Amino acid sequence: MTEQAISFAKDFLAGGIAAAISKTAVAPIERVKLLLQVQHASKQIAADKQYKGIVDCIVRIPKEQGVLSFWRGNLANVIRYFPTQALNFAFKDKYKQIFLGGVDKRTQFWRYFAGNLASGGAAGATSLCFVYPLDFARTRLAADVGKSGSEREFRGLGDCLVKITKSDGIRGLYQGFNVSVQGIIIYRAAYFGIYDTAKGMLPDPKNTHIVVSWMIAQTVTAVAGVVSYPFDTVRRRMMMQSGRKGADIMYKGTVDCWRKILKDEGGKAFFKGAWSNVLRGMGGAFVLVLYDELKKVI
């Protein structure tokens, strides 16, 4: 293997391991966030049974669905997250070579910043093309609030993918893809761009204290998450439409979804579950720091 191939493999491994660990740890918060986002578009949750907020959701889930249901959809998320994050990190460095070749970060700060934004956004969009059906399945499984097998919409990851493909074709697994690409570019651009730029401006980036790295990563993750959150809400609402027919279809398309959420629920609805997203973001920040530490070891 060439040195470049070994470096790529190390990036893939370090990114994937870090992601799988952190995602499982924050899975309960992730499920709460998803339920708050999509409950308005769920056929299983009646208007009078909707969750009032994070605390109500955390209290009711174990009572109504069992404690283990907090991890519903987590397997799909870990499977999805391993290639997503690993590909993101690996491609990010390849895109950095394209966008940042020959750029001096000390004398060309804004050119350096723009290159980091572009490489982060391009890496996220590229990865999304490969793993979107897994992201779709994770959302639908997490939104499934049935207690037992007969009450549940899907029995698991495979059942979800098969049922939606039979009903809507492969296209059904890519519902909300366009708005996802828009959101992922905004999120990843901030996530990688600001993080790398901030680290690059430190006196000795390779030997930065882990606490400083974590603080930078935490801030970046929170800012990126809030900025791109409305796009995430719209894409997940669109995902909830797959498998529906006729009068059950709530939104004619992405633009109609934006318009109806704003008209029927108000601007605040775009940010439902956003606070739990910030809490979950601690796991995302941990991924960035853990990735850097793993690369030193591998």
Swiss-Prot record:
PROSITE patterns from the UniProt entry: SOLCAR (PS50920)
Bilayer-crossing regions: 8-37, 75-99, 110-130, 179-199, 211-231, 274-291
Chain residue ranges for the region called Important for transport activity: 235-240
Primary localisation category: mitochondrion
N6-acetyllysine modification, residue list: 105, 268
Biological process terms in GO annotation: apoptotic process; mitochondrial ADP transmembrane transport; mitochondrial ATP transmembrane transport; negative regulation of mitochondrial outer membrane permeabilization involved in apoptotic signaling pathway
Annotated motif Nucleotide carrier signature motif, positions: 235-240
Placement of Solcar repeats on the sequence: 6-98, 111-201, 212-297
GO cellular component, as recorded: membrane; mitochondrial inner membrane
Record has Protease as a keyword: no
Gene3D superfamilies in alphabetical order: Mitochondrial carrier domain
This protein's name: ADP/ATP translocase 3
Organism for this UniProt entry: Bos taurus (Bovine)
